[in-house]
């Protein structure tokens, strides 16, 4: 297949690109820095620096939309929030415009989202049909991003939305950020530790995306989370045991709010999410339990 990917150099995107190339797909990556694409992935991919380089004659069977400015890396000033929104929603709007003009429409649009869509819901079990409980920045961002991507359906395109949990793998993402303080015995629970953390291993996320490509009956929203979410306290205990290190330095919620401001909601919000629709599809999770994800071979980066 001929596949266009935005966000192809990110933590998930670069592994997805490599996996699709191994299966013989032709991959085009949209990136503001095409040279970076070739350095990270190699010369097997075609690169674009701007969607304006596409014409109505370009034909992609699948578009996978993962692009977006990192949400956690910088203080959420009003200007930063606008950048985070624009790089997701404006780019998605541009993709919709391309799809509208395309002589041959893509068969499938897979577009990113996150479980932040649900807001802070305590112990409530959340499935794809669950309503959001709050309308904070993260929730509005996810809802607006999804609504924009859904516009592709009016042109006969099958749309799959991936509400992604906390993505784990040893070569990046949340786990890599947490490893260093835990290795030095400086890890600990965040807030009261009772907030639910719905996570997924990167290899399972990639398998979900590839299933969406092959299974033409799949459409709509899917929770990309492992079937066994854990509380922050359980996550901390399991990671500390895996590393054989103590976890003795809890981080109070008030201190997180001082240090991170509004971003602290990403660490303190509780989302107990289950992948109901994937389980209905009999999707096989390679890493259904947290310990299995933490102990995966370090060479397994795809």
Regions found by a protein language model. Name each.
Residues 36, 43-94:
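NAD(P)H-binding glycine-rich loop region in Rossmannoid oxidoreductase-like domains
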Residues 215-262, 295, 300-302:
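Mid/C-terminal beta-alpha module of Rossmann-like enzyme folds, strongest
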Residues 265-302:
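C-terminal amphipathic/interface module of NAD(P)-dependent oxidoreductases
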Residues 113, 147-170:
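Conserved beta-loop-beta element that borders a ligand/cofactor-binding pocket
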Residues 133-137, 165-172, 192-202:
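Glycine-rich "substrate-gating" loop/helix at the edge of Rossmann-like oxidoreductase active sites
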Residues 93-135:
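Conserved Rossmann-fold NAD(P)-dependent oxidoreductase catalytic core, especially the SDR/UDP-sugar
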Residues 3-23:
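N-terminal Rossmann NAD(P)H-binding glycine-rich loop of SDR-like oxidoreductase domains
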Residues 179-187, 195-230:
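Alpha-helical substrate-binding/gating segment
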């Amino acid at each position: 297949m001929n596949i266009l990917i935005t966000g192809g150099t990110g933590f998930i995107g670069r592994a997805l690109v490599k996996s699709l190339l191994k299966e013989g797909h032709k991959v085009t990556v949209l990136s503001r820095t095409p040279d970076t694409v070739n350095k990270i992935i190699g010369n097997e991919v075609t690169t674009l620096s701007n969607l304006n380089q596409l014409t109505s004659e370009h034909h992609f069977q699948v578009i996978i939309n993962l692009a977006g400015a990192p949400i956690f890396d910088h203080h959420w000033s009003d200007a930063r929030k606008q950048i985070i929104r624009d790089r997701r929603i404006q780019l998605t709007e541009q993709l919709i415009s391309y799809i509208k003009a395309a002589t041959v429409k893509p068969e499938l649009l897979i577009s990113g989202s996150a479980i932040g869509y649900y807001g802070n819901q305590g112990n409530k079990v959340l499935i794809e049909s669950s309503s959001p409980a709050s309308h904070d920045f993260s929730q509005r961002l996810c809802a607006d991003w999804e609504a924009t991507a859904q516009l592709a359906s009016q042109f006969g395109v099958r749309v799959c939305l991936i509400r992604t949990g906390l993505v784990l793998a040893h070569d990046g993402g949340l786990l890599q950020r947490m490893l260093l303080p835990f290795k030095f015995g400086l890890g600990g629970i965040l807030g009261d530790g009772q907030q639910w953390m719905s996570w997924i291993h990167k290899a399972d996320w990639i398998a979900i995306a590839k299933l969406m490509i092959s299974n033409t009956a799949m459409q709509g929203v899917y929770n990309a989370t492992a079937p066994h979410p854990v509380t922050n306290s359980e996550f901390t205990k399991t990671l500390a045991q895996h590393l054989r290190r103590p976890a003795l330095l809890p981080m109070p919620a008030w201190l997180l709010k001082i240090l991170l401001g509004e971003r602290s909601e990403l660490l303190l919000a509780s989302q107990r999410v289950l992948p109901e629709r994937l389980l209905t599809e009999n999707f096989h999770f390679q890493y259904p339990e947290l310990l299995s994800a933490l102990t995966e071979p370090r060479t397994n980066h795809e």
